[in-house]
Curated annotation (Swiss-Prot):
Protein name according to UniProt: Proline--tRNA ligase
Gene of this entry: proS
Organism whose genome encodes this protein: Burkholderia cenocepacia (strain ATCC BAA-245 / DSM 16553 / LMG 16656 / NCTC 13227 / J2315 / CF5610)
Location of the protein in the cell: Cytoplasm
Similarity section: Belongs to the class-II aminoacyl-tRNA synthetase family. ProS type 1 subfamily.
Entry text on domains: Consists of three domains: the N-terminal catalytic domain, the editing domain and the C-terminal anticodon-binding domain.
Length: 578
């Protein structure tokens, strides 16, 4: 590719609405331009990287035995009504009517459409396993699109859907996709972690997320540096931090805590560790035609509630936070001084695992400006229902018993689910088994955010000059920067020869023949993030040398002109192999 025949739309300044590095650099590097909120044009530089991501994803999906198809972006409402998601999905689902007043949606996912394909095309167990995938544009009407391609409304995604006759088959399909994702993100040259996760609105039983590690990531990941354990903080099991409850050592005592409504303030006033205080959180579940059930969830003062874990407990699937009016009615006091001792009306108490093993702890007295110290289970309170209801935190024991938890930030770029029969039962996707009896198909679903990967890769790979692409997804692998291409025959002939050698070696190279000043050339290609640069100058050529600099290198080095192309080609092959 010659730069004079390519579109390079670099900018010196980022737009005012760009908040994070990837958004700023994608605009400045001429990769994207905003059309509307969360909707972008992908300019030639950006599209080249997208196509490279797609190629790797496609190769690994095919290698894993998945079969490519293409489903429509526009889907009839009837399919979503069959699955139940027409009512369940919120305003993120873009709905519209055609000229005949029929309801349609712009697909954010394709579970319904692919299940419709399966129920019409798969009739026998002999036709399974099968795994369909597509790479397609989707739309989710985010309430507040931001961060460029990281949380856009329109995005490109690879989604795959497996169909199996039994659980063993589903497990095998899931394993193949999991392994394929590990290969994909390894080939993309990204630091990533596969983490156990909650299935969210997609539904299903078993789930892993793939996160690119980045300080700007929206998700907190709990992992163990000395083992294989990794999980989304929402899904990570929080082990009890006290192995065995100690015998009571204090008498229960009401203490004045004027104006101290927070655990930290109470601990400071009483000169006790924060770990001896209890955080009381009041939840409610509604009962048709009757007053709500009120739940008191007890956490250690330094711990945070995990609502996803709570929602999986019996009776709490549709919980909400209690209103202040309900809190006063059941406890006799506003929030800040709540506790399980002496409530006005009966409440259901759930203690986190760590709280259940505590003794001599401090709780609210259900009276403004007072707490109760020296509280103990069995003596002062009945034994509680016990559950894991908190987020893990740094320093907790790892659930696999092989070390302690650390926390990092990640950007979700892939997700694999075992859906089971959630959609096949709802939509009647059955097959005849070996005995001729109809059975629901077991499904898995597997997504990769193609355009999101670009943003995540940049968040992990940049400096103050611009993007630093991994070789596998860089818009170009090498840029040739000739000094005086239009003035020096020697420079032009050498640059053209290098270009031909690199093309022949299968290297994705661009020759900057625009006639720009060196500073402009260097700034453009450093901003765009091309991993390798060769500078061809007349002075160096007279000594048989060409200047080479990798995008991550602090200094340039000189290479023999006659072997420069081969040297750079080998560097690229080594990077891709690694």
């Amino acid at each position: 590719m010659k730069a004079s025949r390519f579109f390079i739309g670099t900018l010196k300044e980022a737009p005012a609405d760009a908040e994070i590095v990837s958004h700023k650099l994608m605009v400045r590097a001429g990769m994207i331009r905003r059309v509307a909120g969360g909707i972008y044009n992908y300019l030639p530089v950006g599209l080249r990287s997208i196509r490279k991501v797609e190629a790797i994803v496609r190769e690994e999906m095919n290698r894993a035995g998945a079969i490519e198809l293409l489903m429509p972006a526009v889907q009839p409402a009837e399919l979503w009504q069959e699955s139940g998601r027409w009512e369940q999905y919120g305003p993120e689902l873009l709905r519209f009517k055609d000229r005949k007043d029929n309801d349609f949606v712009i697909g954010p996912t394709h579970e319904e459409v692919v299940t419709d394909i399966a129920r019409n095309q798969i009739k026998s167990y002999r036709q399974m396993p099968v795994n369909f995938y597509q790479i397609q544009t989707k739309f989710r009407d985010e309430i507040r699109p931001r961060f460029g391609v990281m949380r856009g409304r329109e995005f490109i995604m690879k989604d795959a859907y497996s169909f199996d006759k039994d659980a063993a088959g589903l497990n095998e399909s899931y394993r193949k996709m999991y392994d394929a994702y590990v290969r994909i993100f390894s080939r993309l040259g990204l630091e990533f972690r596969a983490v156990a996760a909650d299935s969210g609105s997609i539904g299903g039983n078993f789930s892993h997320e793939f996160h690119v590690i980045a300080d700007t990531g929206e998700d907190a990941i709990a992992y163990c540096p000395t083992s294989e354990f990794a999980a989304n903080v929402e899904a990570a099991e929080a082990l009890p931090l006290i192995a065995e409850r100690a015998a009571p050592a204090e008498a229960m005592e009401k203490v004045a805590t004027p104006g101290k409504a927070k655990c930290e303030a109470v601990a400071e006033l009483l000169s006790i560790p924060l770990e001896r205080t209890i955080k009381s959180i009041v939840l409610a579940t509604d009962n048709e035609g009757a007053e709500p059930t009120i739940w008191l969830v007890m956490l250690r003062g330094d711990h945070d509630l995990n609502e996803i874990k709570v929602s999986k407990l019996p009776g709490l699937k549709n919980h909400r936070f209690a209103t202040e009016q309900e809190i006063v009615e059941w406890f006799g006091t506003p929030p800040g001084y709540l506790g399980p001792v002496g409530t006005k009306k009966p409440v259901k108490v759930i203690a986190d695992r760590t709280v259940a093993n505590m003794s001599d702890f401090v709780v609210g007295a259900n009276e403004v400006d007072y707490h109760i110290a020296g509280v103990n289970w069995g003596r002062d309170l009945p034994e509680p229902d016990v559950a894991d209801v908190r987020n893990v935190k740094k320093g907790d024991p790892s659930p696999d018993g092989k070390g302690v938890i650390d926390i990092c930030r990640g950007i979700e770029v892939g997700h694999v689910f075992q859906l089971g029969t959630k959609y096949s039962e709802a939509m009647g996707a059955t097959f005849l088994d070996e005995s001729g009896k109809p059975q629901p198909m077991l499904m898995g679903c597997y997504g990769v955010g193609i355009t999101r990967i670009l943003g995540a890769a940049i968040e992990q790979n940049f400096d103050d000059r611009g993007i630093i692409w991994p070789e596998s997804i860089a818009p170009f692998e090498v840029v040739l920067c000739p000094m005086g291409y239009d003035r020096s025959d020697l420079v032009r002939e050498t640059a053209d020869k290098l270009y031909a050698e690199l093309v022949a070696a299968g290297i994705d190279v661009i020759l900057d023949d625009r006639g720009e000043r060196p500073g402009v050339m260097f700034a453009d290609w450093e901003l765009i993030g091309v991993p390798h640069r060769l500078v061809i100058g007349e002075r160096g050529l007279k000594e048989g040398k060409i200047e080479y600099q990798g995008r991550r290198d602090a200094e340039a080095t000189l290479l023999p002109a006659d072997t420069a192309a081969a040297t750079v080609a080998e560097k690229i092959r080594a990077a891709l192999a690694h």
